[in-house]
C-alpha cells in the first residue's frame, strides 16, 4: 500500500543517515569499531 511504501522510504532514509550521525556523535572506544562495521556492511551491498 501507499502507507507501507512511505514507511519503507522513511526507514531507508534513517538507515542511510544513521552512520553519518553516529560518525560525528560516537564516544571513544568500542562504538568506533561498531561504526566501522556498519560502514563496511553499507558499502559491501
UniProtKB/Swiss-Prot annotation:
Q: Does the keyword Metal-binding apply?
A: yes
The cellular location(s) given in this protein's UniProt record come to:
Periplasm
Give the highest taxon in the source lineage: Bacteria
The record lists heme 3 as bound by 45
Residues holding heme 1:
42
Q: Name one GO molecular function term.
A: metal ion binding
What else is on record for this protein? Answer: Acidic tetraheme c3 is not a subunit of this octaheme cytochrome c3.
Which of UniProt's keywords are assigned here? Electron transport, Heme, Iron, Metal-binding, Periplasm, Sulfate respiration, Transport
Q: Kindly provide the name given to this protein in its UniProt entry.
A: Cytochrome c3
PTM comment: the record says: Binds 4 heme groups per subunit.
Q: Which GO terms describe its cellular component?
A: periplasmic space
Organism equals Desulfocurvibacter africanus (Desulfovibrio africanus)
Q: How does it assemble?
A: Homodimer.
- Keyword hit for Electron transport: yes
Function text: Participates in sulfate respiration coupled with phosphorylation by transferring electrons from the enzyme dehydrogenase to ferredoxin.
GO biological process assignments: anaerobic respiration
Amino acid at each position: 500500500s501507499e502507507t507501507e511504501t512511505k514507511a519503507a522510504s522513511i526507514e531507508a532514509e534513517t538507515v542511510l543517515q544513521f552512520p553519518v550521525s553516529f560518525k560525528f556523535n560516537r564516544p571513544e572506544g568500542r562504538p568506533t569499531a561498531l561504526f566501522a562495521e556498519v560502514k563496511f556492511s553499507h558499502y559491501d551491498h
